[in-house]
Amino acid sequence: MVATVFAFVICFSSFIKVKKATVAAYQITSISTERNATGQQQQWTWALTNPNPGNGDNGTLQDVSHWSLALSPLAEASLVSAEYSFDQITWVSVSIQMDRDPTIKTCTTDDVLKFDVGTRGGESTYYRVTFDREFTTNTFATSYIKTGGGRNGCNLYYFAGVGGTTND
């Protein structure tokens, strides 16, 4: 019996092609979580990076067109500002309107904070949000990444983001 199984494996192993596993995923890195100088606000900063830019073929990733964050109702109510930057020096303010994003309607019906700017090649884009209260880190905070051209659809990404409050 063992000889039969061995012969079968040897015979058909020539038909099996082993493909090296590759994982292409955008990287969301927590840069900082800090209180401002007066201690009245907490600021969160993340970097979103495309580690393998391309057209979406052969393990490459298309540029991100926008990044949408889901926030708890308390975080939504405490949101003071949202900004993005390509260099962490010049920051551009964005609307803090929480709303449904029609471009990811097949992924979620939740209201999200939409940063309508994404990545450019392999360079990081930085995102910053400010709250008027302090929050803990949720290592499984939810976000949605939409790619340019929509080829890879909308992608659910978990990241180290805004969690529960620390001062209730």
Q: Which sequence ranges carry the predicted segments?
A:
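Sec-dependent, cleavable N-terminal signal peptides
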Residues: 1-21
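Extracellular or exported targeting regions of proteins
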Residues: 16-168
